[in-house]
Amino acid sequence: QAEAHKGAQKAVDKLMARIDEMIAEMPDYLTGEEKMAIARNNLEMEKALKIKKGKPMDVDKADKQNANPKHVEEYILDSKGIYRDKRGNRYRKNSDYDKKRDTPYSINCQTCAPAYALRLRGWDITAKGNVAGSKLEYLSNGRAFEVWKNTDGTPAQHISINSWLAHKGYLKMTPKRYMEYFNEVCKEEGVYELCIGWKSGGGHATILQRFADGELRYIEPQSDNSAGSGMEWKDVKYLCEIGAATSHNCRGVLRIDNKLFDVSFLDIFDT
């Protein structure tokens, strides 16, 4: 019996050491309660995924399309290309693009955004493609935030664009109001998931990140817009310009770096 007790104590000590190790890796701006809850969530994810969480990744390793490596652009930048966007950038058709194969990886933003956030924590996971009948298709119908929980396990609630408009006494969004909204709801250092509707119709789930120096950056995990990608003009100002004037209640912002991931949605990732 004493031996069994000793073995059990050893297992508990090992578990606590693992939790302490994970907590030590986390950003200082998270609270003690948040760190402990995330560490326990990591253990739950390790058990479900049957892989070990690695060391936290920096922004470059988590981003630069590493969260969605199977994404292929239909058009690629080419100064002599015959296609142009509204900004005058020239493109040519990508000969490597295959519509049937590649479309699922251009409509999977609802997994790219959490994949980026979890990669920052040290999870070497990537986004699956969005195909009919998948959990990803379920999330893409206005349910993107359902993958996140508060530290007490309750469903996380986003700050909807509509509730912010009502609070401000505004009737609709404008580019200036989008900037005001982003700066108000993404005030603290951290990682935020944004669900936004486009002026042209449709919508998108993506990332806004507030850094220690005060910068608010639009990070696009689905298709690279980082410095040097040629697409860095897709910035926060760009989001403000193409955001819809009116939105469904599912549109808004949720801080996610201090949230728990619902393990029932882990099959939206490849490992």
Write out the residue ranges for each language-model feature.
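Glycine-rich short-loop/terminal segments
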Residues: V12, R18-E188, C195, L254, ...
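Long amphipathic alpha-helices with heptad-repeat character
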Residues: Q1-V12, I19
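Active-site or metal-binding loop neighborhoods of secreted/extracellular toxin and effector enzymes
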Residues: G169, P175-T271
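Non-Sec secretion/translocation targeting segments of pathogen effectors
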Residues: Q1-E3, C109, T271
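Residue-level marker of positions within ordered structural domains that often coincide
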Residues: Q1, P114, D213
